[in-house]
Design a protein with these regions (language model features):
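NAD(P)H-binding glycine-rich loop region in Rossmannoid oxidoreductase-like domains
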Residues: 1-24
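Hydrophobic structural elements of the Rossmann-like NAD(P)H-binding subdomain
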Residues: 1-2, 42, 97, 158
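Glycine-rich NAD(P)-binding loop of the Rossmann-fold in SDR/ketoreductase-type enzymes
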Residues: 17-28, 75-76, 134
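Conserved Rossmann-fold NAD(P)-dependent oxidoreductase catalytic core, especially the SDR/UDP-sugar
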Residues: 24-72
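Substrate-positioning beta->alpha
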Residues: 28, 79, 110-111, 127-147, ...
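Active-site Tyr-X1-5-Lys
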Residues: 34, 68-96
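NAD(P)-dependent short-chain dehydrogenase/reductase
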Residues: 90-133
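Mid/C-terminal beta-alpha module of Rossmann-like enzyme folds, strongest
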Residues: 142-209, 226, 231
Length: 233
């Protein structure tokens, strides 16, 4: 069984349903697999579930640390991973992957593919942060290979490249043959932006283009090491 279903949202209004689906949904999936004697479950989590620490460099050995830098999405993915580990303790074979920001074909109105929509519209700014990125095909291929293998009770970071948002946004713009974003969206500017978007939301049903969580996470420098998956797969 491959379990990749989850809500990815940084909007306050989505938190209750995100906690319910991401955590309870995974618990239900684990219970069903145990009840039906499923051979193995492959769970696609996220690098967000690794948490945040002061080093800004992460491997699979990092321990979760509760702090203000963890988004609610990250918390739900961490807790959903715990449901997988519960299943392992109860006799279920399982493997977990932790992809970085996934890029590839998809619905531009959802999750990380909104990058394409934003840049295509003529985004003038780029965040100053850095993060791990990966092609959706690498994500799918890795979980298939790991789930079919004899590997169990392990987790793997799936990141092709640690890149700045500046590079990613400019590459996307170049592919569209449109002007590249040239202005830095500093943490200070983003703090103003998410508050402004919050005020606009009071008078409109439109989703804010930036939230408190996305403003802060996009300013962070996060480096993810992929040595384990490269060496073992």
């Amino acid at each position: 069984v491959y379990h990749s279903a989850a809500i990815v949202s940084f909007l306050k209004k989505d938190r209750d349903i995100m906690y319910k689906i991401n955590i309870e949904g995974t618990a239900n999936m684990v219970n069903a697999c145990l009840a039906e004697n499923v051979k193995k479950i492959g769970f696609i989590s996220s690098v967000a579930a690794i948490g945040r620490n002061k080093s800004n460099t992460y491997t699979e050995k990092n321990k979760w640390s509760t702090n203000k830098d963890n988004s609610h999405y990250a918390i739900t993915k961490f807790k959903s991973e715990n449901e997988i580990w519960r299943g392992v303790q109860e006799g279920l074979d399982a493997v977990i992957t932790n992809p970085g920001i996934i890029l590839g074909p998809g619905d531009w109105s959802r999750s990380s593919t909104t990058f394409f929509k934003s840049v295509k519209k003529g985004l003038p700014y780029y965040p100053v942060g850095k993060n791990g990125f990966v092609d959706v095909r690498d994500v799918s291929n890795s979980i298939i290979q790991l789930t079919k293998s004899k590997i169990t009770a392990e987790k793997y970071i799936i990141v092709a490249e640690n890149s700045s948002y500046e590079k990613i946004f400019k590459t996307i713009a170049s592919s569209f043959k449109i002007p590249q974003p040239e202005k830095k969206a500093t943490p200070f500017l983003l703090e103003i932006a998410w508050r402004y978007e919050g005020l606009k939301k009071l008078f409109s049903s439109r989703k804010p283009s930036i939230t408190k969580e996305t403003a802060r996470t996009s300013s962070m420098i996060n480096i993810y090491e992929n040595n384990k998956i490269v060496e073992e797969l």
